[in-house]
Each structure stands twice: as C-alpha cells, then as structure tokens.
UniProtKB/Swiss-Prot annotation:
Protein's recorded name: Non-structural maintenance of chromosome element 3
InterPro entries, alphabetized: MAGE, MAGE_WH1, MAGE_WH2, MHD_dom
GO cellular component: chromosome, telomeric region; cytoplasm; nucleus; Smc5-Smc6 complex
PANTHER family in the cross-refs: MELANOMA-ASSOCIATED ANTIGEN MAGE ANTIGEN, NSE3 HOMOLOG, SMC5-SMC6 COMPLEX COMPONENT
Organism whose genome encodes this protein: Saccharomyces cerevisiae (strain ATCC 204508 / S288c) (Baker's yeast)
Keywords: Cytoplasm, DNA damage, DNA recombination, DNA repair, Nucleus
Cellular localization per UniProt: Nucleus; Cytoplasm
Coiled-coil ranges from the UniProt annotation: none
Subcellular location, principal: nucleus
UniProt record, GO biological process: chromatin looping; DNA repair; double-strand break repair via homologous recombination; regulation of telomere maintenance
Keyword field contains DNA damage: yes
C-alpha cells in the first residue's frame, strides 16, 4: 500500500471520529459555536471559568450530566481543527510573562514549553488554516485599491453614510478599519520585538511618530482612537505586556514586552516570514535570517 493510500485511510478515520463527536456530543457542538462566535466578535482571550460555565449551561439545556473539562476540550478541538481549521490553545501563566524585562539575551534560546492544553487557565482561538500567500496578497491589493477610492480631495470618506456602501472595504473581503488596525499592530509588535523585548513607553511613542501616528492626543485616522487608547486595547488583548517600575529619579517608568497572545499568534517562524516579506529577501538570502532575528529580539519567545 502506498503512502498516499495510508494518508487517505488516516484522513478517513479522523473524519469518521469527528463525525461521531459531532453526532453524539451536542455540548461540544454548542461550545464550538460559542467559541467561534466569540472569536469573531471579540477576538479575546477566554478564561477557563467562562468555558466551564458555558459547558455547564449547555449540559443543563441538553439534560445530560456535566462532562469533564478535559474530555470536552479534546472534543471541541477535534471539531474546531478538522471542520474549521482552528485550535483552542492554552496560554502560559501571566506571571511568567512579567519576569525578566532587562532586555538581555539570557533567556533568548529558552524555548516555550508544550501547550498546556486543557490545564491552562486562559485560552486563545488560533487559525491553523495553511497560509496562502497569493490569497493574502490579493486581499491586501484589493483592500488598498478600495481604500484609495475612498480618498476624495485628500479626505477619507469611508465614514460618510451618504457615500453609500457598495464600494466599501467591508464588501470586498476586508474593512478599512481592520486594515489600519493590523498595520499599526504589526508596527508596534515589530518595534517591541526588535527592541529586544523591552521598550520604554516614551521610546515606543517616538518610534510610532515616525510612522505618522499622532502622539498629541488626536485620534488615528480611520481607527478613530488615540494611540494611548490603542495601546491599552493591545494590553487588554495581551498582544503586549505593560510593566511599571518606580524610580527615585524618573518617578514611574512604564515599559512594554511581548504578550502571550503575540507568542501564540505570531510564532518565530511567522516573524521570520514577516521580516523576509518586508525586506524583500529571496529564499537564498535568508540563510542567516533566523540567527540574526534571534540576536535582535531578546527573550520575546521565552516564558
């Protein structure tokens, strides 16, 4: 039997197993709908207590005994991964994320442990659908083209109801706000990464000014939010971690590090691809890229 036949048999076995779960575990079905809905609307971290509460409520509605969390976690992920291409991943303790912060490379090569699975206290929904560069490029080009059409005499008219909705980014695979948000987020994360995972608040703001992001309290165009409020939002979503220290000379000193969500969503390999794209490097030019990045990002992927 060929390896292709073996792979087909494995896929069929997995499909049958997932179909059995979908059929026999109504609580898992409801949990998957809840998790996907929450991920779509809030893009937030989900606590273990919240998941247990929803599981308990779903079990009560189905008039069945409350199942174990570990079994539910396994069945939920089986459906998420095999049907939708997602994974519910446990996050490491937040206390570990606050350790360090001196910008040294002492922990750079300390790899992150295996995912905590059902034992974690907080979880994040990850998209495991294989990356398609051509499709992503198409979305970006389409979004950028549509955005340009919303600039009239130097003014953005996307928020003007009178302009209609037939040609908005939302109707063309993306939204203008989403495009800007992801762009600013990428800039902020790269600044923190390549400041060896330790940057002062004032330094971050200065860097962002060079990208045209206002620091005078005025709102960022399209996002309609100040940079201070955006940073607070990124803290809340745990893309970055805020550290506060008391100094006899400078008073309160605020700095930032990479957060758990970024570690989970943007792994080292993804960061390498991002740098490769930004720098326009061909494959043969990336031989030393991994080592160069490791030297530059401090303990960003340590815990």
């Amino acid at each position: 039997m060929s390896s292709i036949d073996n792979d087909s048999d494995v896929d069929l076995t997995e499909d049958l197993a997932v179909a059995k779960i979908v059929k026999e575990n109504p609580v898992a079905r409801k949990m998957v709908r809840y998790i996907l809905s929450r991920g779509e609307s809030q893009n937030s971290i989900i606590t273990r207590n919240k998941l247990q509460s929803v599981i308990h409520e779903a079990a009560r509605e189905e008039n069945i005994a409350k199942p174990s969390f570990s079994k539910m976690f396994m069945d939920i992920n089986a459906i998420l991964y095999n049907v939708y291409g997602f994974e519910l991943q446990g996050l490491p303790s937040k206390n570990n994320m606050n350790a360090g912060g001196n910008g040294s490379n002492s922990n750079t090569n300390k790899s992150m442990p295996e995912p905590l699975g059902h034992r974690a206290q907080k979880f994040i929904l990850l998209n495991n659908v294989p990356h398609s560069k051509n499709f992503d490029d198409f979305k970006i080009l389409q979004s950028a083209h549509t955005y340009e059409e919303l600039i009239v005499t130097g003014e953005y008219i996307g928020d003007d109801i009178a302009s209609g909705t037939s040609n908005t980014l939302e109707s063309k695979l993306s939204t203008d706000r989403d495009l800007v948000y992801k762009g600013v987020l990428s800039v902020i994360l790269c600044i923190v990464f390549f400041s060896k995972n330790n940057i002062l608040h004032q330094e971050l703001i200065k860097f962002l000014e060079t990208f045209g992001i206002p620091s005078d309290g005025s709102k960022i165009a399209i996002l309609n939010i100040t940079i201070e409020d955006l940073i607070k939002s990124l803290e809340k979503r745990e893309y970055i971690v805020r550290l506060e220290e008391k100094s006899d000379t400078d008073g309160e000193v605020i700095s930032y590090r990479i957060g758990r969500r970024t570690q989970a969503e943007l792994g080292l390999e993804s960061l390498e691809k991002l740098v490769q794209e930004i720098m326009g490097l061909e494959k043969e030019q990336t031989k030393s890229l991994h080592d160069d990045i490791i030297k530059s990002i401090g303990d960003s992927y340590s815990i």
